[in-house]
Design a protein with these regions (language model features):
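Bacterial N-terminal signal peptides that target proteins for export
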Residues: 2-15
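C-terminal motif of bacterial Sec signal peptides marking the signal peptidase cleavage site
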Residues: 24-27
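Bacterial signal peptide processing site
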Residues: 29-32
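Signal-peptide-cleaved, periplasmic/extracellular N-terminal interaction regions immediately downstream
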Residues: 42, 48-217, 221
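Ser/Thr-rich low-complexity repeats and stalk/linker segments
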Residues: 221-309
Length: 309
């Protein structure tokens, strides 16, 4: 063997040995441990943020420490509730889900960077009576390992992690039936637990409409709209591009507006547009979404609305 060939072989062997050593050390110190969800999304995140996944992990067995806490917490129908302290927890590590005899549970695991946080940061919960939407605002959350997913066919339907226009992130939970809720704050590691208890069968207002990579929060289907019209929601459409179109009963376009969301590659991005409505009466159709990159066909949400005039 030539000296050149021997030298290359020796270098290759050293590189392989170094790689094996790094791999073993990573396993020993848990460096490769990251929250896992059901399936990975098709989108890619930038190099300075973790790649978010789609799906809710199931809670295995009972949630440690919740027994004593839940015994002193009651289910309520409050419109607004808040709690937590500080802003050290800046990451949503996972969203987990469990079904109990008379309620369903969602758990937000919170972290500082890649590691579990010790205390629950400041949060605000908003809920409307008879509405299929409950929102948890986390102003300190800057990144997330999970962007959304489905729960099941019972009370809880799905969730979305959205970058807030005011900074931080919020989690929207979509619910199929009227409900009451209770919130539990768990420390070391930090977890925010929301339990949902059904209270009826039919909602006064259904959850926001969903289609393609778009969620339309306002207006809801069959809403009465007036001038000016505020359209809000969130999406994961390519390049954060969204088109809002309102047509009259004959299908003629009354107004069209392009609006960008504040994220799309990492998690759901919020958008909002205020539109001056031209004169029209009767029913209309509101479409929010984008065109398919290959054939231009519409992908998004389409809901009926009516004018108040």
């Amino acid at each position: 063997m030539s000296i050149r060939g021997w030298g290359l072989g020796r270098i290759s062997a050293l590189l392989l040995l170094s790689l094996l050593t790094v791999t073993l050390l990573a396993g020993c110190f848990g460096l490769d441990r990251a929250p896992r969800s059901v399936r990975v999304s098709d989108s890619t995140a930038s190099s300075d943020v973790p790649e978010s996944t789609v799906g809710a992990s199931h809670i295995d067995g009972g949630l440690a420490g919740t027994g004593d806490t839940s015994a002193h917490a009651t289910f309520v129908e409050k419109a607004v509730e808040s709690g937590g302290s500080g802003n050290d927890a800046d990451t949503m590590l996972a969203v987990r889900y469990g079904v109990h005899d008379d309620y369903e549970r969602a758990v937000i695991d919170l972290g500082t960077g890649e590691r579990p946080a010790g205390t629950v940061p400041e949060w605000t919960l908003t809920s409307s009576d008879g509405d299929g939407l409950l929102r948890v605002d986390l102003p300190s959350a800057m990144t997330t390992y999970v962007s959304g997913g489905k729960f099941g066919e019972g009370l809880l339907g799905s969730f979305h992690v959205v970058r807030s226009p005011d900074g931080g992130m919020f989690v929207d939970f979509f619910v199929h039936q009227p409900y009451r809720y209770r919130v539990l704050q768990m420390q070391d590691p930090a977890r925010l637990v929301v339990d949902f208890e059904p209270t009826g069968v039919n909602l006064d207002e259904p959850p926001p409409a969903q289609g393609g990579n778009t969620v339309l929060v306002d207006p809801r289907p069959n809403s009465t709209v007036s001038d000016p019209l505020t359209v809000s929601g969130y999406s994961r459409n390519p390049e954060a591009a969204n088109t809002v179109t309102l047509t009259d009963p004959r299908g003629e376009v009354l107004v069209r507006r392009n609006v960008r969301s504040n994220d799309w590659s990492h998690t759901w991005g919020y958008f909002e547009a205020t539109i001056d409505l031209p004169p029209f009466s009767g029913k209309g159709t509101l479409k929010v979404g984008t065109g398919n990159a290959r054939d231009g066909t519409f992908e998004g949400v389409e809901v009926p609305v009516r004018t108040s005039r």
